[in-house]
Swiss-Prot record:
Name of the protein this chain belongs to: Protein POLLEN DEFECTIVE IN GUIDANCE 1
Compositional bias of kind Polar residues: 33-42
This protein's encoding gene: POD1
Annotated tissue distribution: Expressed in inflorescences, siliques, roots and shoots. Expressed in early embryo, endosperm, mature pollen and pollen tubes, synergide cells and weakly in antipodal cells.
Pfam families, alphabetized: DUF747
An example Gene Ontology CC term for this record: endoplasmic reticulum lumen
Location(s) in or outside the cell: Membrane; Endoplasmic reticulum lumen
GO biological process: embryo development ending in seed dormancy; maintenance of protein localization in endoplasmic reticulum; pollen tube guidance
Quaternary structure and partners: Interacts with CRT3, but not with CRT1 or CNX.
Length: 624
C-alpha cells in the first residue's frame, strides 16, 4: 500500500499476518529516508502457552506509529485482527498540516473506505485524513466493528455537515468518488490556491450576461441566419477593428516610406558615382602632381598618408586594368552561353553573392591599407623597415582582392549581356528569380535599425554595379550589333532599372512594417549620408556608406577600351597617337564636368537637407 504524504510518496509495504503464521508479528518496511519517532505503543505480548490454550481466539496486535515528515504531524494506526471469518487489515491515517505560510494550523479529518463482502462504501470527511478498512479472505470481528463504529459515525456526521447530503442509515450506496476542491499542499507546507484564469472569468461573465448563449445550437437555421445578418460586421469572427495607429502604418507602407526610401537609395547611388568619377579624374591628377613635385625637388621626401594612399590606388587600378585587358571577353561569353548545366539566372545569382562578399572584404582591406599608409608616413626611423613591410603586404593583399573582385564583376556583366541578347526570355527569368529571391531572403527576417541602414547602402551600391553592367552591354552592342539596336537596349535597360526600383520599394516597405520601423528612420539615414558627404562623421557612428570603386573602374575601362580602339582612324602611328590623346582629353573633360556637377549638387543637397533636419528637430516637425 502506497501512502501519499504532503506531496511526497512514502513507499513501504505492509505485510499482514496470515492465519497460518500466527506466531509472527506484523512487519512494516519503510524507506531509510523517512524519520520515525520513538512514539510506538504496542499491546503487551501474551505468554506462548496461554496463547496455545486459547486457540479459538485470535490474537490482537495494535501498532501505533507516528511518522513526522516535513514538519507534518502524521500518525498511522495499523491494526491486524482475526475473527471467526478471516482477517481484516485496517489503516487509519491522520495528518496535521500547517499551511498558508505557517501562520495558522489546520488539522484534517479522514476518508473511510470499507470493503465488506464485495461491497464498498466510501465516506469523505475532512481533507488530509484517511481511514481505510479492507476485508481480506474473511469477515470482520465483532470487536473491531465496535471499535470503529464511533469513528465511522463521526466521519459520517462530518461528511453530512460538509456536503449537506442526508443519508439514511439503511442506505448502502455503491462506490463513488466525491472530490472536493481542497487546497493542495506542497512539500514546504504552503498551499497552492486555485486561480481562475482571465479566459474563464470572461466566459462566466458572458454566460451571466446572456443566459441563452449556450442554447444557440438548439435554434433554428433561419434564426441563426438572421442573427448573422443583423449581428454586425460580416467578417467579425476573423478580423478585428483597427485604430488610427494601424491606419498610419498602412499609409506609411504605401506612400510615405517608398518615397523616402527611393530618395535615400538615389542619393547613395550618386554618392557612389561621385566616388567613381573621383577615382578617374581626381586621383590621376594627384598622382601626376606627386611625380612632378618629386622631379622638381630632386630629393627624396617621405610622402604623406594621402599621397601613399593615392599611389597605392593608382597601382591597383593599373594592375587590374592590364590583367583584365588580357582577358578574352568573347571566350567567356560563349562559355557562359554555351553551357547547359546551370541556368543563366543561377549563374548571375552566384556571381552576385560573390560580388557582395568581395565588396565587404575589399572595404576592410582598403581600410587596413590606408591605416598602414598613415603609419608609414609618421613612422620613426627605427620602425621604418617594419612599417614599410606592413604597407607592402597590405598593398599586395589589396591588389589580389581587387583583381578577384574585378573578374567577378566582369563575369557578372557578361552574364547580364547574355541574358539581354538572348531570345528565350532569359532576361525575364533573371529578373524574376533574382528579385524575388532577394525579397524572400530579406522580408521575412528580423532586422534591426542598423541592419536596415546597411541594407539601404547595399542597394545603392547594387544599382551602381547594374549601371556599370549596362555600360558593358552598351559597349558590346556598339561593337557587335547591326541594325536598329539602340531602342531595344533602352527598353531592356529601363526594364532592369524599373524592376530593381520596384523590388527595393516593396522590400523596404514590408521590412519597415514587420520590424516596426517608422518612415522618419529613413530620413535619419539620409541625414547621416549627407553628413558623410560633407565629411561630418561622428566617431560613434556605426554605419557608413563603404564603397571601393576600383573593381568597377577596371571593368568599365576594360569594356570601353575596344570601343575607342575601333573608332580610331586608320592612319600612321603619329596620327593615331594624336587621335588617342584627343579622345582621352575629351573623355577626361566630360568626366570632370560630370564629376563637378554631381559633386556640387551632392554638397548643396546635403547642406540644404542638414539645415532642414535641424529646423525640423527644433520645431518638432515630422514631415518631409
Amino acid at each position: 500500500m502506497a501512502i501519499r504524504s504532503s506531496g511526497r510518496k512514502l513507499s513501504f509495504e505492509i505485510l499482514s499476518q496470515n492465519s497460518s503464521f500466527e506466531n509472527d508479528d506484523t512487519s512494516i518496511r519503510r524507506s531509510s529516508s523517512d524519520p520515525i519517532t520513538g512514539n510506538v505503543a504496542s499491546e503487551s505480548p501474551r505468554d506462548y502457552g496461554k496463547r496455545k490454550r486459547s486457540k479459538k481466539k485470535k490474537k490482537k496486535v495494535n501498532q501505533v506509529e507516528t511518522i513526522l515528515e516535513n514538519g507534518d504531524s502524521h500518525s498511522t494506526i495499523i491494526t491486524g485482527s482475526s475473527g471467526d471469518f478471516g482477517e481484516t487489515t485496517t489503516m487509519f491515517e491522520n495528518r496535521l498540516n500547517y499551511y498558508g505560510g505557517g501562520g495558522s494550523g489546520s488539522s484534517g479529518g479522514g476518508c473511510v473506505v470499507t470493503l465488506l463482502d464485495g461491497q464498498t462504501v466510501h465516506h469523505n470527511g475532512f481533507n488530509f485524513g484517511e481511514l481505510r478498512q479492507r476485508n481480506v479472505n474473511g469477515s470482520v470481528d465483532g470487536s473491531n466493528d465496535e471499535r470503529w463504529s464511533d469513528t465511522l459515525s463521526s466521519d459520517k456526521k462530518l461528511y453530512m455537515e460538509e456536503t449537506s447530503v442526508e443519508l439514511s442509515p439503511s442506505e448502502n450506496p455503491p462506490f463513488q468518488e466525491v472530490q472536493h476542491q481542497f487546497p493542495r499542499s506542497e512539500i514546504n507546507g504552503n498551499v497552492v490556491r486555485r486561480l481562475d484564469t482571465e479566459a474563464s472569468l470572461d466566459w462566466k461573465q458572458l454566460v451571466a450576461d446572456d443566459p441563452d448563449f449556450l442554447s444557440a445550437e438548439t435554434r433554428s437555421p433561419m434564426k441563426y441566419f438572421m442573427e448573422e445578418i443583423y449581428g454586425g460586421i460580416s467578417l467579425r469572427s476573423t478580423t478585428t477593428p483597427g485604430n488610427d495607429i494601424e491606419r498610419e502604418r498602412i499609409y506609411d507602407t504605401i506612400f510615405r516610406l517608398p518615397w523616402r526610401c527611393e530618395v535615400l537609395i538615389d542619393t547613395g547611388f550618386f554618392v557612389c558615382v561621385n566616388s567613381f568619377l573621383s577615382l578617374l579624374t581626381v586621383m590621376p591628377i594627384r598622382v601626376l602632381l606627386i611625380f612632378m613635385d618629386a622631379f622638381k625637388n630632386r630629393q627624396f621626401r617621405r610622402p604623406s598618408a594621402s599621397e601613399l594612399s593615392d599611389l597605392a590606388c593608382f597601382l591597383v587600378l593599373a594592375t587590374g586594368t592590364i590583367l583584365l585587358g588580357r582577358t578574352d571577353i568573347s571566350l567567356i561569353y560563349h562559355m557562359i552561353r554555351g553551357q547547359s548545366t546551370i541556368k543563366l539566372y543561377v549563374v548571375y545569382n552566384i556571381l552576385e553573392i560573390f560580388d557582395r562578399l568581395c565588396q565587404s572584404f575589399c572595404g576592410d582591406v582598403f581600410g587596413a591599407l590606408f591605416s598602414s599608409a598613415k603609419g608609414l608616413s609618421i613612422s620613426p626611423p627605427e620602425k621604418l623597415r617594419f612599417s614599410t613591410w606592413r604597407f607592402v603586404s597590405d598593398l599586395a593583399l589589396t591588389m589580389a582582392a581587387s583583381i578577384l573582385h574585378s573578374f567577378i564583376l566582369l563575369a557578372q556583366a557578361i552574364t547580364l549581356s547574355t541574358c539581354i541578347v538572348a531570345h528565350n526570355n532569359a532576361l525575364l527569368a533573371l529578373l524574376v528569380s533574382n528579385n524575388f529571391a532577394e525579397i524572400k531572403s530579406s522580408v521575412f527576417k528580423r532586422f534591426s535599425k542598423d541592419n536596415i541602414h546597411g541594407l539601404v547602402y547595399a542597394d545603392s551600391i547594387e544599382r551602381f554595379h547594374i549601371s556599370a553592367f549596362l555600360v558593358s552591354v552598351l559597349a558590346q552592342n556598339i561593337l557587335e550589333s547591326e541594325g536598329a539596336w539602340f531602342g531595344n537596349f533602352i527598353y531592356n535597360a529601363t526594364t532592369v532599372f524599373f524592376c530593381e526600383m520596384m523590388i527595393d520599394i516593396i522590400k523596404h516597405s514590408f521590412l519597415a512594417k514587420f520590424n516596426d520601423i517608422k518612415p522618419i528612420a529613413y530620413s535619419e539615414f539620409l541625414q547621416a549620408l549627407c553628413e558623410q558627404t560633407l565629411n561630418i562623421r561622428p566617431e560613434d557612428r556605426k554605419t557608413n556608406l563603404t564603397f571601393v570603386p576600383l573593381a568597377p573602374a577596371c571593368v568599365v575601362i576594360r569594356v570601353l577600351t575596344p570601343v575607342y580602339a575601333a573608332h580610331l582612324p586608320y592612319s600612321p602611328l603619329p596620327w593615331r597617337m594624336l587621335w588617342m590623346v584627343i579622345l582621352f582629353v575629351i573623355t577626361y573633360i566630360m568626366l570632370t564636368s560630370l564629376k563637378v556637377l554631381i559633386g556640387m549638387g551632392l554638397r548643396k543637397h546635403a547642406t540644404w537637407y542638414i539645415n532642414r533636419c535641424r529646423r525640423r528637430n527644433s520645431s518638432h516637425l515630422h514631415n518631409d
